[in-house]
Amino acid sequence: MNTTLSGKIALVTGGSTGIGLATAQELAAQGAKVYITGRRQAELDAAVAKIASTAVGIRADVSKLADLDEVYARIAKEEGRLDILFANAGGGDMLPLGAITEEQFDRIFGTNVRGVLFTVQKALPLLSTGSSIILTGSTVSIKGTANFSVYSASKAAVRNFARSWALDLQGRGIRVNVVSPGPIKTPGLGDLVPEEHRQGLYDALAAQVPLGRLGAPGEVGKAVAFLASDAASFINATELFVDGGMAQI
């Protein structure tokens, strides 16, 4: 049994499905006690059952500050501290430039940017020396991607958050890094297109990856667990791509 993270307290936002769920499972497998958030209770309950007997699910929307207050109040009461924060909750839509609405823009930036900022800010009183913050970025933050400009811009903001927050937190011994997945086969990826077009999307994306395939959520989870661990103790303000080389060539 891997006990790298034994005794650590972790929070994974957006932890009920996809990358968040796989990461929560990996953190728990390495010994951490894991709290997850999600917006849908049924998915949250199912995820907790898949993670560990000690896992805790809290229904919350990270774009709502009152929800975040409730999350951290519970962790403070039950644990008194937080060692690992994976600010993962987010999402986006395929939106051509001429079709983007104010509502869509506000929703995507509300979760991916505003939500990440306040997820981290409100965690600060619980984070102590040696804590690790990991943000979910994306390869699209450094590439032009048709019909994906709002999501891409939101993830570029997340990348800069890590750079800036590493400076804001210097002296506290808290590391801030970004894990940036490429095409990972998750429900969220499939939901970008109608069901009849999903395999075509998967094939087109895999063709752009030097390794010739899509990634698995668990592969991102292992990268997050590494960044959360003492093995990454001198890694700060960096971006770790888990993309099979897609954004690097």
Locate the predicted segments by residue.
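Conserved glycine-rich cofactor-binding loop
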Residues: 9, 16-17
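Substrate-binding pocket helix/loop in short-chain dehydrogenase/reductase
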Residues: 96-97, 101-109, 201, 205
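Residue(s) in the substrate-gating loop at a strand-loop-helix junction
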Residues: 138
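Short C-terminal tail/terminal secondary-structure segment
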Residues: 143, 225, 236-249
